[in-house]
């Protein structure tokens, strides 16, 4: 795959095929020829079967002269023709070949050039035929030639037996290894399950113990609180009510003392001076 060439910008106009002027029937030339008897689609010469289209000129984007590319190719020793020259050059070569009596040769060369251009162009692909090397192919037997050292049948059989025994041993060891691996996995899973269960049981026991301790503490606190409340109530009931500080407190005190003296028999005897 080659490198990309330089980009060339192309700008297309509104009429890239340059057909608007020929299709326009309102032009002076078209109307003048129609008045002279000319009709659309007929020839432009004296005879009716002459050219019906205008002369088409291809754009030449280089400074090379007519046949320069062909001359360059002949100088390189190719001796062929190409279609990359100016328009009409192939037809000119065919005419010259026909005049020189080499029409078939020239036509063949031109066809080959056209085919090569198609193959080597943008969409062309070259394929390499996949064949075997001549040194490794026997044409008579039509088989590949093997250069390996030929071993005896006995050696081959011994080797085959050894390979079979090795494969059997490998299978046994592999099976044993798989079984051991499976047993280890099962033991590991059982151990994990047991550890999980033990942890859960320990946690449950701890939670139960904590709940019991909390309950005992709460009961003790309640008992202490009820005992203190009872003692306070008894103290309050046994204690005398505090004196009321009012304006009649002095009189109530005097009345109380008087009653106390009346209630006491010993005090009454002293008052009335009675001796036993």
From Swiss-Prot:
One of its GO terms (cellular component) is nucleolus. Residues 25-71 form the G-patch domain. Residues 229-239 have a biased composition (Polar residues). Keywords: Nucleus, Ribosome biogenesis, rRNA processing. Residues 173-218 have a biased composition (Basic residues). The keyword rRNA processing applies. Its main location: nucleus. One of its GO terms (biological process) is rRNA processing. Residues 1-23, 152-261 are annotated as: Disordered. It is found in: Nucleus, Nucleolus. It comes from the Eukaryota. One of its GO terms (molecular function) is nucleic acid binding. Belongs to the PINX1 family. This is Protein PXR1.
């Amino acid at each position: 795959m080659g490198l990309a060439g330089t980009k060339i910008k192309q700008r297309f106009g509104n009429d890239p095929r340059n057909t608007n002027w020929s299709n326009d029937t309102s032009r002076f030339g078209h109307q003048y020829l129609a008045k002279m008897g000319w009709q659309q689609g007929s020839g432009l010469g004296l005879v009716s079967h002459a050219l019906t289209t205008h002369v088409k000129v291809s754009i030449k984007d280089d400074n090379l002269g007519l046949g320069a590319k062909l001359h360059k190719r002949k100088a390189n020793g190719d001796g062929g023709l190409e279609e990359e020259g100016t328009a009409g050059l192939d037809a000119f070569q065919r005419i010259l070949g026909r005049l020189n009596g080499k029409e078939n040769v020239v036509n063949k060369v031109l066809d080959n050039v056209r085919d090569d251009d198609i193959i080597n162009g943008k969409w062309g692909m070259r394929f390499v035929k996949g064949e075997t090397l001549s040194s490794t192919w026997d044409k008579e037997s039509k088989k590949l030639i093997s250069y390996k050292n030929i071993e005896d049948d006995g050696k081959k059989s011994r080797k085959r037996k050894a390979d079979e025994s090795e494969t059997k041993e490998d299978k046994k060891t592999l099976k044993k290894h798989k079984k051991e691996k499976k047993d280890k996995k099962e033991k590991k899973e059982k151990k994990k399950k047991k550890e999980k269960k033990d942890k859960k049981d320990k946690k449950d026991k701890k939670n139960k113990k904590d709940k019991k301790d909390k309950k005992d503490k709460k009961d003790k606190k309640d008992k202490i609180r009820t005992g203190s409340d009872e003692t306070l109530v008894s103290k309050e009931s046994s204690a005398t009510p505090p004196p009321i500080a009012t304006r009649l407190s002095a009189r109530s005190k005097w009345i109380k003392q008087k009653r106390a003296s009346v209630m006491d028999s010993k005090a009454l005897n002293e008052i009335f001076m009675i001796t036993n």
